[in-house]
A protein has these predicted regions:
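Second-shell loop/turn segments in exported
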Residues: 24-31, 85-87, 120-123, 145-148, ...
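The feature captures the short pre-catalytic strand/loop hairpin that immediately precedes
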Residues: 75, 156-167, 228-242, 329-336
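Short active-site loop at a secondary-structure junction
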Residues: 37, 44-55, 75-134, 166-180, ...
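Short, solvent-exposed loop/turn and secondary-structure capping segments
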Residues: 67-69, 145-150, 215-219, 374-376
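Active-site helix/loop module of the DD-peptidase/beta-lactamase fold
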Residues: 87-91, 103-143, 147, 163, ...
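Extracytoplasmic/secreted proteins, especially bacterial periplasmic and envelope-associated proteins
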Residues: 33, 37-44, 90, 95, ...
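Catalytic loop of the DD-peptidase/beta-lactamase superfamily, centered on the K-T-G motif
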Residues: 17-69, 189-194, 198-201, 206, ...
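Bacterial Sec-dependent N-terminal signal peptides
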Residues: 1-26
Length: 395
């Protein structure tokens, strides 16, 4: 009997070692294959669009791979790494949606209630008839993409909202809007009785394990904060306008952002309420063409053609009013979909996409606002490669 136990204890370390070596070999093999595909699409794009630096991260069933190109600063020639901090632009909106969903899970916020319930300053305004859900799905009734130029701070934004008149009935047209997402963030923060920035930086980011993500980059991390580059190739960083924190204010790394994707793929051990909130952001509420509008996120049935993604991320969808068909009842979170979001500031361009059923995802961060068509096309190509490498059955 003793001999049998000894034999077992001798075998167990051997098996563990063999499994680790096999995993390592698979990782290296996948990494080499992805590197070739990545080089084939990233390097030509950098040359065509004069992009100084790009950080790409992908995940396959929780295994993360990183591919870095070029410079975080052309002036200092500091190379891009997975710890380089990029402005993620409107991808920030997905974190705002997460805060709102988190407030709902905690019984503090209802998406069916009107915005003015949580923002007393707007009572008696058009927002007595605009729901929190409308703010989370760009269906407020025609809020513009940006605030008028004369609106320069949050107090002026509130005054603007007080007198704003809708073009449409709420819930009938999708009008992509930074002010609308700003309202969502304000309502969520008010329901939680905390400043928006504090909730993001002290609750959401730490709970997600995103230790190098910020609204305000601390002085100690400025050395890792990339410079963006304008159309005229001048080094720039975002100049925050009203409600910037809620709409486009997050700065993050490829490492943190692929961790965020893993959270959406349910591959991390998170607080139960936060995980529920994240999954609730995948609920589909409106159809706009072939795209389903979730809470900020946009989704498509998977597999999806690149033409469908390009249509859903087109200038028409971003800059124009589009008919929104309400889905009743809303579509519960589905695994067989591709979920995506673009993000830009004047000097940065980003894209995030993931497929829950295949447990694959990609994050592309660049310090140049290059065409969305290129971002989508690159990501679609890489995701197709990841799909081939993904296990037939996710663990």
């Amino acid at each position: 009997m003793i001999r049998n136990y000894i034999a077992v204890f001798l075998i167990i370390p051997y098996l563990a070692c063999a499994q680790t070596e096999n995993k390592s070999a698979t990782y290296k093999e996948n990494n080499a294959k992805i590197q070739v595909e990545m080089d084939n699409v990233i390097r030509p794009a950098m040359q065509e669009f004069n992009i100084p630096g790009v950080a790409v991260a992908v995940t396959i069933n929780g295994e993360n791979y990183f591919y870095n190109y070029g410079f975080a600063s052309k002036e200092t020639q500091q190379p891009v790494s997975s710890e380089t901090i990029f402005e993620i632009g409107s991808i920030s909106k997905t974190f705002t949606a997460t805060i709102a969903a988190y407030a709902e899970v905690n019984g503090k916020l209802s998406f069916s209630e009107n915005v003015s319930k949580y923002l007393p300053a707007l009572r008696g305004s058009a927002f007595d008839k605009v729901s929190v859900l409308n703010a989370a799905t760009h269906t407020t009734g025609g809020l513009p993409l940006q605030f008028p130029d004369e609106i320069i701070d949050n107090n002026q934004a509130i005054k603007y909202f007080k007198t704003w008149k809708p073009k449409f009935e709420a819930g009938t047209q999708r009008s992509y809007s930074n002010p609308g997402t700003g309202l969502l963030g304000m309502a969520a923060a008010a329901s939680l009785d905390q400043p928006f920035e504090k909730i993001m930086e002290k609750t959401i980011f730490p709970a997600l394990g995103m230790m190098h993500s910020y609204i305000t980059v601390p002085q100690a991390q400025m050395k890792n904060y990339a410079y963006g580059y304008s159309k005229t190739d001048e080094p720039i960083r975002v100049n925050p306008g009203p409600l910037a924190s809620e709409a486009y204010g997050v700065k993050s790394t490829a490492n943190d952002m692929i961790h965020y994707v893993d959270a959406h793929l349910q591959l991390l051990k998170l607080d139960k309420k936060l995980q529920t909130a994240i999954q609730n952001t995948h609920i589909g509420y409106f159809k706009i063409g072939e795209m389903t509008q979730d809470l900020i996120w946009e989704q498509y049935p998977y597999p999806v053609e690149v033409s469908q993604l390009l249509a859903g991320n087109s200038s028409k969808i971003i800059f124009e009013d589009n008919v929104a068909t309400k889905i009743s009842p809303p579509v519960k979170p589905d695994a067989n979909v591709l979920i995506n979001k673009t993000g830009s500031t004047n000097g940065f361009g980003g894209y995030v996409a993931f497929v829950p059923a295949r447990r694959i995802g990609i994050v592309i961060l660049a310090n140049k606002n290059y065409p969305i068509t290129a971002r989508v096309t690159i990501a679609h190509h890489i995701l197709n490669q990841l799909d081939r490498l993904a296990p037939l059955k996710a663990k």
